């Protein structure tokens, strides 16, 4: 049974984050921002204009500094004095969907609806790079742990890209539509699992494990795909059906076990997976990939793809039939999941779920 935090929002909650001290911050529709005590009481609130707050993220080096996105703006706040933004940037071309601050707090990445990613040098307070390669909405961007100049992005163009801040082009790209075409042989299995076969694999979210080399993607086809980064490329490790509708959220938990993965979906379900069982059990290289052959219909000139693309083998995914991971925890939340986070609340690791109701739901994680 979930514990509900109420009284902070009258509109749908869109995003959550918690700092190392367990302070929780939530952002909602119509510009409403709220901080919460461990008792579930609103501590302070701020209205950041009329635009929805789409992302909140604490600095990894200063637990009092909070980065938020609302509309085309980025506000930097001091949560000790939540009266107004300490600084505000308006550098993006369209509504911002996602922010990511690297571990050293030297750079901030902001992905928007135009498909662009703005890289802000936080020391000089200016844009140092603009990354333009997504042809549709860039839904998520995230810096890799232990690698402050490397980041991943994904979008509704069904592309996942690996970037290095020293370059303006992605160093590696995977097209999920091509990946899905190779997975069509799994159709019978997917029907049995209740997946929506006709949903395109629009990529909603990525999360990187603490090692910095393993990451997960959640997509509109309900699947969760696990990749491993080796050097300047990444390859498919495993893919499985996580939700009967789109997988909107994936988050690696910051626990002693590095591969606990939390997922949330448009089916109203929240699940916890141990994806390390597969990664550690195999103890082998990722499934081999080969560069995709250039054809008239898919040449870089036609598609604007100037980076390497790979044609991922579906072999790993076919093994789902016998190796589909079982959820360690499955929660019927009952509403489409807008956001997932985790925090230590009253000494217990806890899942926090945001949805359209304006409440924050808490589910305890036990025996992990």
Q: Model-derived features: where do they sit?
A:
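A short helix->beta-strand "capping" segment at the edge of beta-propeller domains
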Residues: 1-10, 40, 187-190, 316-329
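Short C-terminal beta-strands that terminate individual repeats in beta-propeller domains
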Residues: 3-8, 43-49, 86-91, 128-133, ...
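Conserved blade-ending motifs and adjacent loop-strand segments that build the rim/top face
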Residues: 237-251, 288-344
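Canonical WD40 repeat/beta-propeller blade segments in eukaryotic WD-repeat proteins
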Residues: 10-17, 51-58, 89, 93-101, ...
């Amino acid at each position: 049974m979930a514990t509900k935090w109420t009284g902070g929002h009258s509109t749908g909650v869109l995003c959550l984050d918690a700092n190392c001290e367990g302070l929780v911050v939530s952002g909602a529709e119509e510009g409403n921002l709220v901080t919460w005590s461990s008792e579930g009481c609103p501590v302070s609130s701020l209205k950041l204009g009329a635009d929805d707050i789409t992302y909140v993220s604490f600095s990894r080096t200063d637990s009092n500094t909070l980065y938020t996105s609302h509309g085309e703006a980025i506000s930097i706040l001091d949560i000790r004095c939540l009266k107004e933004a300490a600084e505000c940037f308006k550098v993006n071309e369209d509504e911002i969907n996602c922010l990511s601050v690297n571990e050293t707090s030297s750079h901030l990445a902001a992905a928007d609806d135009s498909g662009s990613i703005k890289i802000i040098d936080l020391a000089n307070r200016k844009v140092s790079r603009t990354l333009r390669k997504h042809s549709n909405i860039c839904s998520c961007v995230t810096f890799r742990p232990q690698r402050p100049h490397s980041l991943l992005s994904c979008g509704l163009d069904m592309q996942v890209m690996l970037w290095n801040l020293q370059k303006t082009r992605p160093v590696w790209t995977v097209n999920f539509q091509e990946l899905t075409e190779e997975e069509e042989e799994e159709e019978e299995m997917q029907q049995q699992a209740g997946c929506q076969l006709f949903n395109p694999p629009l990529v909603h979210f990525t999360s990187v494990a603490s090692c910095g080399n393993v990451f997960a993607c959640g997509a509109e086809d309900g699947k969760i795909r696990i990749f491993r980064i080796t050097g300047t490329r990444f390859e498919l490790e495993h893919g499985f059906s996580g939700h009967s509708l789109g997988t909107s959220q994936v988050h690696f938990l910051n626990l002693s076990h590095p591969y606990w993965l939390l997922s949330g979906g448009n089916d109203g379900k929240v699940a916890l997976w141990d994806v390390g069982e597969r990664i550690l059990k195999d103890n082998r290289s990722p499934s081999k990939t080969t560069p995709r052959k250039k054809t008239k219909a898919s040449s870089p000139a036609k598609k604007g793809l100037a980076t390497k693309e790979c044609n991922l083998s579906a072999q790993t995914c076919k093994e789902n039939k016998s190796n589909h991971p079982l959820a360690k925890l499955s929660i019927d939340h009952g509403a489409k999941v807008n956001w997932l986070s985790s925090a230590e609340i009253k000494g217990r690791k806890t899942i926090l779920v945001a949805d359209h109701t304006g409440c924050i739901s808490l589910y305890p994680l036990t025996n992990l």
